[in-house]
Amino acid sequence: MKLPWMGRRAVRRHGLVIAWDGQALAYVQARPDGHGRMQVQRFGVERQGEDTPEMFAKRLAGLGLKGLPAHVMLRPAQYQMLQIDAPAVPPEELRTAARWQIRELVSQHVDDLTLDVLKVGDEKVRATGSLFVVAAPNAEIRAVMQVAQALRCEVDVIDIHDLAQRNLQSALARGQGGTARAQAAVVMTSDNQALLTICAHDELFYTRRIDLGEGFMQAAWGGEAQSAAEHGLAVSGPGQESDRAQRLVVEIHRSLDLWDRTWPMLVLDRIAVQAGARTAELALWLGRELGHDVQPLELSPLFPGFEGGSEEDRQLCWPLLGVLLRSEDRRL
């Protein structure tokens, strides 16, 4: 399937970013403000609900985004992120070779997938000989392209959440003294899954999805669990070694131990977390449980105008901000 996939050319740092998960369209429109930041002009979420496809397309056309170049971001549930040993082939043959190599690792036939590849880490630190392979079902790509058509937008690039998260981590690191040290981010991408990424030198070195079970974000953990325990209430939380809550801590510990063994020259500087309305609570709890400096992933200094709206809508829109910082000009 021939598509405007992750690309190798620099992309303009302004415009429109959209994401479609089959139920809701999230969008962010922004432009540079001349001070190294992106001014968010508007953002929002349109849910299809009970609308027919025709009714929903009409509603999307009414958003007034016609003619704008759009970048698409796929959410983690819409693709697989794999890591493989780099095939010993010329760069122009990497995708073909990777397609053959991942055939036993993907959940459907490789002919039904669109692939792209990305080097792991930064070779200035150490050559890894590894590749990330992004595998997205053609059906997911077609669906999001149909929504873009309903918006009457031209899609320039299709990007993914992992790389958007990398961009945000790197931008925050630059504002805090540089990207030479490693930074981790733990982001709740759904009610039951966290995405852990570790970056350095503006590159993605490690990514992992941690499944936590349904209802993790509604469970009593962190401050809620501690408060309930102080009042003598029975709770499912970290103080009582709840399996669901402790799984996140255990899996992060495992990933950080692996990181220390694999990349001893890149000391982990900080961990940032994002969990919507419970971000501060998650940061406090994980900082205590992990023994690391854990801070909220705070984007407002980089994106003035990203304020207002419901917490649910903001949670769907904020990852799109990372696509606005995209500058994929490397070649494999």
Where are these regions (language model features)?
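Hydrophobic/aromatic-enriched cytosolic interaction surfaces used to assemble or bind macromolecules
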Residues: 1-332
